[in-house]
A protein has these predicted regions:
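Sec/Tat-exported extracytoplasmic proteins
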Residues: 15, 19-27, 61-65, 83, ...
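Mid-length scaffold segments of soluble, non-membrane domains
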Residues: 45-46, 50-73, 84
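Stable alpha-helical elements in mature extracytoplasmic
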Residues: 7, 12-19, 53-60, 75-79, ...
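Active-site-adjacent substructure of cysteine-protease-like catalytic cores
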Residues: 72-132
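Mature, folded catalytic cores of secreted/periplasmic enzymes
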Residues: 12, 68-69, 108, 125, ...
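Noncatalytic regulatory segments and standalone regulatory/sensor domains
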Residues: 4, 118-179
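Residues that form generic nucleotide/phosphate-binding pockets
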Residues: 38, 42, 64, 82, ...
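Active-site-adjacent structural segments surrounding the nucleophilic cysteine of cysteine proteases
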Residues: 1-50, 103, 119-121, 176-179
């Protein structure tokens, strides 16, 4: 999704906006439903000169009463436990040409998207990819192995967790990775 003044580099605030809108619909808290430019304004790092600062994004979500943290996962199995509790995971990935079939852009040195589920065949992961050209192309299926390579080789399994305080989450000792 391309936005004026932010364009294709707003993947982090766009993903965060998606997750906050999800929690707005789940909790009925309309204050969580923020437009992407609003989230981008709230997450902009003037030193970095961009919106991809992970702690800035989680801090922004926290200002609305959500629990938010940057974590390192070591497996997609850990992510499956969060998804089973209804918590989407915002993952930082990178890949080269031909390494992530079906991606809306051919390659990226750093891209954030939302893991929203796993296909019943176990071989594909369901994501919302903010690089899509328009809302209709945001939901995508990626090959599980290709996605894992893009995530673990790219960022070492870095992800944001954002969810309401008091939400039933997985046992942290087996689900949060090494952070």
């Amino acid at each position: 999704m391309i936005y004026p003044n932010g364009g294709e580099v707003w993947c982090s605030p766009t993903s965060l906006s998606m997750v906050m809108a999800y929690w707005s619909s789940k909790t009925g808290n309309r204050n969580l439903n923020k437009a992407v430019p609003t989230v981008a304004d709230g997450t902009y790092d003037y030193v970095y000169r961009g919106n991809g600062n992970w702690p800035f994004n989680t801090a922004y979500a926290s200002t609305f009463g959500l629990k938010a943290s940057v974590n390192r996962f070591s497996s997609l199995g850990q992510v499956e436990r969060w998804i089973s509790k209804g918590v989407p995971v915002l993952a930082s990935i990178s890949w080269g040409r031909g390494q992530l079939d079906g991606a809306p852009i051919p390659a990226s040195n750093g891209h954030l998207l939302v893991i929203r589920g796993f296909h019943s065949d176990g071989e594909r992961i369901i994501v919302n990819d903010p690089a899509a050209d328009g809302n209709s192309g945001v939901k995508r299926l990626y090959d599980r192995q290709q996605f894992a390579a893009a995530w673990f080789r790219g960022s070492g399994g870095i992800a944001y967790l954002v969810y309401p305080k008091g939400w039933n989450i997985p046992d942290e000792t087996s689900s949060r990775g090494s952070w």
